[in-house]
C-alpha cells in the first residue's frame, strides 16, 4: 500500500448555476475523490465570488476547498475526471507540505475574524472615545 499524503483541491464552479446544480457539482467532486481512493478530511465552501478575470466568459464563480488524503497516483485519476466536468470552471490540487501547514497555523493564529467579539469590543471602545469629545 502506498503512503498517503495530504492534498487540497480548490474548485471554482460556474456561479450562474442554480443552488441545486452547485450542490450536485460539489457532491460529484467529493464522490470522485472518495471513489478514487481519497479520504476527505474537511470541506470549506466559500460561496459565490467575482472572479479576477473572465473564465469561459463567466465572471462569477462558486469557490470551495476540499482537504483530503490520498496516494500520489490517485491524483492523476481525480484530475482526469475533473478535467471533463463542464460545470467546473477551474480546479487545482496541491500537496499540503509541512511548510504550508505551518504557515496556515501562523496565519490562523494572528488573524482576526471580522465580526468577532474582539472586533465588536474594539469598535465600541473607539466609538465611546469619540462621543466624549
UniProtKB/Swiss-Prot annotation:
The keyword Ribonucleoprotein applies. InterPro entries: Ribosomal_bS6, Ribosomal_bS6_sf, Ribosomal_S6_plastid/chlpt, Transl_elong_EF1B/ribsomal_bS6. SUPFAM superfamilies: Ribosomal protein S6. Signal peptide: none annotated. It comes from the Bacteria. GO terms for cellular component: cytoplasm; ribonucleoprotein complex; ribosome. Keywords: Ribonucleoprotein, Ribosomal protein, RNA-binding, rRNA-binding. Gene3D superfamilies: 3.30.70.60. One of its GO terms (biological process) is translation. One of its GO terms (molecular function) is small ribosomal subunit rRNA binding. Binds together with bS18 to 16S ribosomal RNA. Belongs to the bacterial ribosomal protein bS6 family. This is Small ribosomal subunit protein bS6.
Amino acid at each position: 500500500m502506498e503512503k498517503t499524503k495530504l492534498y487540497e483541491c480548490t474548485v471554482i464552479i460556474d456561479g450562474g448555476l442554480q443552488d441545486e446544480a452547485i450542490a450536485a457539482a460539489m457532491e460529484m467532486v467529493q464522490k470522485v475523490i472518495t471513489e478514487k481512493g481519497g479520504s476527505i478530511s474537511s470541506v470549506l465552501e466559500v460561496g459565490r465570488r467575482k472572479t479576477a478575470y473572465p473564465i469561459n466568459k463567466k465572471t462569477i464563480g462558486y469557490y470551495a476547498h476540499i482537504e483530503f488524503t490520498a496516494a500520489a497516483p490517485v491524483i492523476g485519476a481525480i484530475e482526469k475526471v475533473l478535467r471533463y466536468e463542464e460545470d467546473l470552471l477551474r480546479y487545482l490540487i496541491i500537496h499540503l507540505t509541512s511548510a504550508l501547514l505551518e504557515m496556515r497555523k501562523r496565519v490562523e493564529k494572528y488573524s482576526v475574524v471580522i465580526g468577532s467579539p474582539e472586533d465588536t469590543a474594539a469598535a465600541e471602545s473607539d466609538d465611546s472615545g469619540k462621543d466624549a469629545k
